[in-house]
Design a protein with these regions (language model features):
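Gly/serine-rich nucleotide phosphate-binding loop at the start of the catalytic core
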Residues: 2-105
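Catalytic micro-motifs at enzyme active sites that drive phosphoryl/nucleotidyl and oxygen chemistry
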Residues: 30-32, 171, 181-184, 199-205
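Generic detection of short hydrophobic beta-strand segments and adjacent strand-loop junctions
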Residues: 42-44, 165-169, 231-233
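Stable alpha-helical structural segments in soluble proteins, enriched in small hydrophobic residues
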Residues: 68, 104, 108-119, 389-399, ...
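Long, hydrophobic, amphipathic alpha-helical segments used as structural scaffolds
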Residues: 69, 73-76, 116, 120-127, ...
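Acidic carboxylate diad motif detector
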Residues: 85-188, 320, 324
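Positively charged, helix-rich recognition surfaces that bind polyanionic ligands
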Residues: 175, 188-404
Length: 404
């Protein structure tokens, strides 16, 4: 906030954008340097031997997590106290744990500690830590970069206990960044990926908010914008419903443990991955476009989880329509893409009557509480409104007020 005040004092009288590069002293004093952590995800192509080593590491990390969780639960039940156990304590009893990367086991312990902290600090959103199953089809482990133990050279990446693994480096890491941790994962379809977390300095330059946008959540189209075309989300899950249902029926008819069942399981997994990738790509591109164009974006702080649940008496339920478009993920992506540029995402209180207020005169029309009312005329000024467009404009103006 202090930075914004300083910027306003430096503005010309006509309130145009100020060029900080016109005055190097002002430019130097007003910029902000922040440390940013950013993850890059790449496809990797391990050899058969490396796949086996990955599988062993996945299993050991899962074993340590489950073993430590089980011992903690038992110890707490007997004594009422917390057990501070570590992976090193189990290596004597289970010597095969020494064959894998020790940092993978240490990170499994950190994940368990984080699960407990989340549970104790926010029980409303986090449940008790649960045992990990090998039957989910998803496996992963994380390791840290220590003195160059993880590094990239050409089209290969070096990993502890694994060696050099072929990687599809479709985009370079951020220049002058440092590799902190990597996470190796295997999808249900059998593909291997690596997520590389890097740390770098990001220079954020103060801006005067000039371009404002309001987004109203749309059940079928992701959002309706105050000053843009609607998102028109393609509903990838709905489009793939028939194909996915057919593949799942075939899977249910395959004999347990047979090779044909495993092949069909992979086909189903590939369909799910395709839908997830399509959704991810769409959300990232939309968020990038909006973050580049606008300085402040306002949204309603709604609970998608609550909207997806059927209300008592079956009054309404948005179900799959809500969860398919990935609104929460879109908001998270949009928020950090704005923050990288020194911009702001403003979350409006969910009880703010954005759909009931006439954005022209401010009259409150209570009949729009009924969701079936999609268009209405203001009794005071006579303006004709589209429900969602009017709400988006009101959200924009409220975001403008809150960011002032």
């Amino acid at each position: 906030m202090e930075r914004n005040v300083l910027v306003k004092k430096l503005l010309p009288a006509d309130n145009r954008r100020f060029s900080y590069r016109d005055n190097s002293e002002i430019y130097r004093k007003t910029r902000q340097v922040t440390i940013v952590n950013k993850a890059y995800r790449y496809r990797i192509y391990p050899t058969t031997e490396q796949k086996n080593m990955f599988a062993k590491t996945f299993g050991c990390a899962r074993f340590i997590y489950n073993k430590m969780l089980g011992d903690r639960l038992e110890y707490y039940k007997e004594t009422g106290k917390k057990l501070n156990n570590t992976p090193a304590q189990y290596k004597a009893e289970f010597p095969w744990l020494k064959e894998v990367d020790s940092l993978a086991l240490a990170n499994a312990q950190l994940n368990l500690n984080k699960a407990y902290n989340n549970f104790w600090n926010n029980r409303k959103h986090f449940g008790k830590p649960r045992f990990k199953s090998r039957k989910t089809g998803r496996s992963s482990y994380s390791t840290n970069n220590q003195k160059g133990s993880v590094r990239l050279e050409g089209n290969k990446v070096k990993l502890p206990k694994i060696g050099w693994v072929k990687i599809c480096l479709h985009r370079p890491l951020m220049e002058n960044s440092t590799i902190k941790t990597v996470t190796i994962s295997r999808t249900p379809s059998g593909k291997f990926y690596i997520s590389i977390l890097v740390e770098y300095e990001n220079q954020i330059f103060p801006i005067i908010p000039k371009n404002f946008l309001g987004l109203d959540f749309a059940m079928h189209g992701l959002y309706v914008a105050s000053d843009e075309d609607n998102a028109n989300y393609p509903n990838f899950m709905r489009k793939a419903d028939k194909k996915l249902a057919k593949a799942q029926r075939r899977l249910s008819k395959r004999q347990e443990g047979s090779r044909n069942r495993d092949k069909q399981r992979i086909r189903v997994a590939i369909l799910h991955e395709k839908i997830a990738n399509q959704r991810q790509d769409f959300l990232h591109k939309k968020a990038r476009y909006l973050a580049d164009k606008y300085d402040v974006i306002g949204i309603e702080d709604i609970s998608v989880k609550a909207m997806a649940k059927r209300k008592k008496g079956g009054k309404f339920s948005f179900g799959k329509s809500v969860t398919d478009n990935g609104w929460n993920k879109f908001v998270n992506i949009l928020e950090y893409k704005l923050a990288w540029q020194g911009k702001q995402l403003v979350k409006i209180d969910k009880w703010y009557p954005s759909s009931q207020l006439c954005h022209i005169c401010g009259y409150k029309y209570n009949k729009t509480k009924d969701l079936s009312v999609r268009e209405w005329d203001c009794p005071k000024c006579g303006s004709h409104h589209n429900r969602d467009k009017n709400a988006a404009i009101n959200i924009r103006e409220e975001a403008r007020r809150m960011s002032a």
